[in-house]
Regions:
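Conserved active-site alpha-helix within GNAT-family acetyltransferase domains
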Residues: 80, 104-122
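A short, internal acetyl-CoA/4′-phosphopantetheine-binding micro-motif in the GNAT/acyltransferase core
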Residues: 67-75, 202-211
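Conserved beta-strand in the GNAT
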Residues: 48-56, 63, 68, 183-195
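Hydrophobic adenine-recognition pocket in adenosine-nucleotide-binding enzymes
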Residues: 6, 67-69, 102
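Conserved GNAT acetyl-CoA-binding A-motif
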Residues: 90-105, 220
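Conserved acetyl-CoA pyrophosphate-binding loop and the N-cap/start of the following alpha-helix
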Residues: 73, 77-85, 211-218
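Active-site rim helix/loop that mediates acceptor-substrate recognition in acyltransferases
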Residues: 18-42, 49-54, 151-183
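Amide-forming acyltransferase catalytic core, primarily the GNAT-like/NAT-type
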Residues: 116-196
């Protein structure tokens, strides 16, 4: 048994147990190449590959994603060992925080995270929106924003801790917008989905239904 970095030659073996993870399938085949390029795509091998996870290291935080275990080898702490391996690398590089995004109905992953002393940090709602032509909206681009008020934003499904530089860069690219009506303000931070073309991921901070509607109209 060993944990090593995955290579392009491992893809076929991994995809055999990454097809029906969710009701709609899985996304691992779409991100495989980009995760290989980023590095830190860890593979648990027991004669054959039986588990993977990817780690994204950014400043003092670790983002652990894409944990997949062959169903024939579950309940053997393979996922826990992969996560611990990713954490150790982070600790050696002065990481202070480790995060995972887990569906609230994924009881097995929640149990695994709890067993490793992870705690629920925040609970978010996810909605999807299809494009629609609309030129009637009341929004403005934000030129400055406080990272204490908006401490995180989503980029390629990673909850990234904001910094002054990140927010300035996003503002320069017109990726922070707000709507202010009747003293209520909603703000949206637009992130890219690097692994899927023509897809945006938007972090919304809603102040009222009316201002949220204006932002959604613009995003469409």
């Amino acid at each position: 048994m060993e944990i090593r970095n995955a290579t392009s030659f491992d893809k076929n073996s991994i995809m055999k147990f990454c097809k029906h993870t969710f009701s709609w399938g899985d996304y691992i085949d779409k991100v495989w190449s980009s995760w290989l390029e980023e590095g830190n795509l860890f593979l648990f091998e027991q004669e054959l590959p039986i588990g993977i996870c990817h780690a994204f290291y950014f400043e003092n935080q670790i983002w652990i994603e894409g944990i997949r275990i062959d169903p024939n080898f579950r309940r053997q702490m393979v996922a826990s060992k992969l996560v611990t391996h990713a954490e150790l690398i982070g600790k050696n590089n002065n990481a202070s925080f480790s995060y995972m995004l887990i569906d609230t109905e994924n009881k097995n992953s929640i149990y695994m995270a709890n067993s490793l002393n992870y705690e629920i940090f925040q609970t978010w709602n996810y909605y999807s929106l299809i494009p629609k032509k609309n030129s009637n909206f009341k929004i403005e681009f934000v030129k400055s924003i406080d990272s204490d008020v908006f401490p995180f934003y989503v980029d390629s499904w990673r909850w990234i801790k904001t910094t002054k530089k990140i927010l300035v860069d996003l503002s320069t690219q017109n990726k922070i917008i707000k709507s202010n009506l009747n003293g209520k303000t909603s703000v949206a931070i637009i992130g890219d989905y690097k692994h899927l073309a023509k897809t945006l991921i938007v972090t919304l901070f809603s102040g009222s239904f009316e201002t949220l509607f204006e932002i959604l109209s613009y995003l469409q």
